[in-house]
Amino acid sequence: MLRDVNDEVLARGLRVAHDLFDGAVQRGKLTAEQAAAGKARLTSTTAWTGFGDCDLIVEAIVENVAVKQRLFAELLTVARSDALLATNTSALPLEEIAALLPDASRVVGLHFFNPVSRMPLVELVLGRATARAAAESALQFVKSLRKTPVICRSAPGFLVTRVLFFYLNEACRLWEEGVATEVLDAAMQAWAGRLADALDRRSRGGCDRLHLR
């Protein structure tokens, strides 16, 4: 089940999902029947109807603490008391996101890396209040997707993004020293491929998230 702010955004999201299924068929990863069954399971809504039946709800909205806090407060009104609540944040501490909740024991971080359909790594982030049962449920979910979980504590940037901070900051220092953006990104692309377009990556990721606290 996919929820978003309006039908236009939902339609775009469903198109992307359908394209991923079609691509998997073309690459021989799925049969046409499996892809059709997967598409049939996808539903979309702008309301909270049906979320009371969910075992797991994953938030993947804008990287803004206040907005995420409001969403998690809404989730408490619709989710089952035993449902696992996850955030896909790549850098924000769970304690801040769950600050308005009376009980954060079932809140975890599930940071999927882009493109999600192909990247195997998932950061499983555990907050100070995360219960052992919630952590185990999240771990089993990640494994069921045949992805590689890495368990890390809740801290700014977690594990991968925290290492990435320093790489991106050095790229900005080179830019301040006069190295052109195009030159720097082209050189890093030639050296390390798609993950190395440092300045473009920092811009798309949001500079406000790349400051260690």
List PLM regions with ranges.
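Rossmann-like NAD(P)-binding element
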Residues: 8-12, 23-85, 91-96, 100
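NAD(P)+-binding Rossmann beta1-loop-alpha1 motif at the extreme N-terminus of oxidoreductases
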Residues: 1-20
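Beta-strand segments within the central parallel beta-sheet cores of soluble alpha/beta enzyme folds
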Residues: 4-5, 35-41, 106-109, 184-189
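Generic beta-strand/beta-sheet core signal
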Residues: 3-6, 45, 54, 59-60, ...
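Long hydrophobic segments that form regular secondary structure
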Residues: 63-64, 68, 72-82, 131, ...
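Rossmann-fold dinucleotide-binding core
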Residues: 87-162, 194
